[in-house]
């Protein structure tokens, strides 16, 4: 059985669902003519129960934050507003943070060898939002469906691109025809592979450990990040007073830490954080995922485009992965819209414009994150002194500091006008 569509988006994560909703919101395709295809599409779930560590069960009672959280920029917030996602997010699972403090192992938080960003200095209400991962996923699926996207649960088996269109064979025997296919199926994208697009990159030989902790001192609506020789530790503020940790460390250290009991792990976080928030109590299990740098050598083919992790996977140290992917969606929609209603959605010209814009922006971001990881993981004493001096210099140069903050907010850079936030 064959079904004819305008666009097929492969991947039903936040990036894929936002891509579909945005195409419909911008009137680039008609309701019922855009499909989101994935082997499994999550259905919105009732409020979750987080399995607490037994010794900390009482402390974890309350808002059931998902273990995975996202740090979203102002530009991402604006894009989610346009797609109808933002207003549907549960308020108690979205938390605005007002400050960010970054410091080197040899320095102190808010002191020597540290760098602090404050929303008040930028004239902004906040620096961004910490958002529950499952809540965001659920609402993005809802928004895509509400906008008129067809949700299809099936694995993609083959992609055949011709001058006239794209034929997509599904594992259940169905076939889809479209003018454009968009791969949003993650770093291990099957669609990218079927399109014959190669990737490059390297592994960091690191894992990212994630968990939620309760701290003796209030987080003060601040995202804290300390750079250690084995990788950075971030403490991200949650609405219930707890913090979500993202600890990037070597594979060997990751195995050691995951083998610790809750008290031992909490003690390790306390030491690694330099005691910035006082005593630590672990309130959830600890999960982990491997870290690598990967980028597609091409973002587009005739009648095909990559967005999100299918195009680029970066180090999580600055929490920019999803923000970059959402900007891909906005930029692709902008390029398709600039081509005019008469142009075919699969025309190569608009797709190449998208590639030129986002490839350079994403390369800058990936190179910067890779460079930071290498710089702060070096144990060379000379480089350590350079790091501390560099953080201090950036902190004293207000125009440099402001420029970095504005870029992270999505206020600066090659950002589509319809999502570009403007400072008050």
Where are these regions (language model features)?
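Conserved FAD-binding catalytic core of PHBH/FMO-like flavoproteins
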Residues: 80, 167, 180-286
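Beta1/beta-strand and adjacent pyrophosphate-binding region of the FAD-binding site
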Residues: 2-15
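FAD/FMN-dependent oxidoreductases across multiple families
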Residues: 255-348
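C-terminal helical "tail/cap" subdomain of flavin- and related membrane-associated enzymes
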Residues: 334-424
């Amino acid at each position: 059985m064959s079904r004819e569509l305008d666009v097929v988006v492969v991947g039903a994560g936040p990036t894929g669902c936002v891509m579909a909703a945005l195409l419909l919101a911008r009137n680039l395709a008609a309701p019922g003519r855009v499909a989101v295809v994935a082997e499994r599409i999550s259905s919105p779930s009732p409020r979750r129960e987080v399995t607490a560590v037994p010794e900390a069960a009482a402390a974890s009672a309350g808002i059931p934050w998902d273990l995975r959280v996202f740090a979203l920029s102002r530009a991402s917030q604006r894009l989610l507003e346009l797609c109808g996602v933002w207003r549907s997010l549960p308020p108690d699972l979205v938390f605005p943070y007002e400050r960010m403090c970054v410091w080197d192992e040899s320095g102190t938080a808010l002191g020597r060898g540290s760098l602090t960003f404050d929303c008040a200095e930028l004239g902004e209400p906040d620096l961004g939002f910490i958002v529950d991962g499952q809540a965001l996923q659920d609402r993005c699926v809802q928004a895509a469906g509400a906008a008129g996207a067809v949700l299809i649960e099936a694995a993609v088996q083959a992609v055949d691109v011709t001058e006239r269109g794209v034929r997509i064979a599904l594992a259940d025997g169905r076939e889809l025809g479209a003018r454009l296919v968009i791969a949003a199926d993650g770093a291990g994208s099957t669609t990218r592979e079927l399109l014959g697009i190669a990737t490059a990159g390297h592994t960091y030989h690191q894992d990212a450990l994630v968990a939620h902790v309760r701290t003796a001192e209030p987080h003060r609506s601040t995202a804290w990040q300390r750079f250690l020789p084995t990788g950075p530790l971030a403490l991200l503020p949650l609405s219930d007073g707890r913090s979500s940790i993202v600890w990037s460390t070597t594979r060997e250290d990751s195995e050691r830490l995951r083998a610790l009991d809750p008290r031992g792990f909490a003690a390790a976080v306390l030491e690694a954080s330099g005691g910035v928030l006082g005593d630590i109590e672990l309130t959830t299990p600890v999960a982990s995922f491997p870290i690598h740098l990967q980028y597609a050598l091409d973002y587009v083919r005739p009648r095909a485009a990559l967005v999100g992790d299918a195009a680029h996977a970066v180090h999580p140290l600055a929490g920019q992965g999803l923000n970059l992917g959402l900007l891909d969606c906005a930029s692709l929609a902008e390029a398709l819209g600039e081509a005019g209603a008469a142009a075919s959605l699969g025309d190569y010209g608009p797709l190449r414009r998208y590639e030129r814009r986002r490839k350079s922006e994403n390369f800058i971001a990936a190179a910067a994150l890779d460079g930071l990881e290498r710089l702060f993981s070096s144990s060379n004493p000379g480089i350590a002194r350079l790091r501390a001096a560099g953080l201090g210099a950036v902190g004293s140069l207000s125009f440099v500091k402001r420029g970095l903050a504005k870029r992270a907010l999505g206020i600066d850079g090659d950002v589509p006008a319809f999502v570009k936030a403007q400072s008050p």
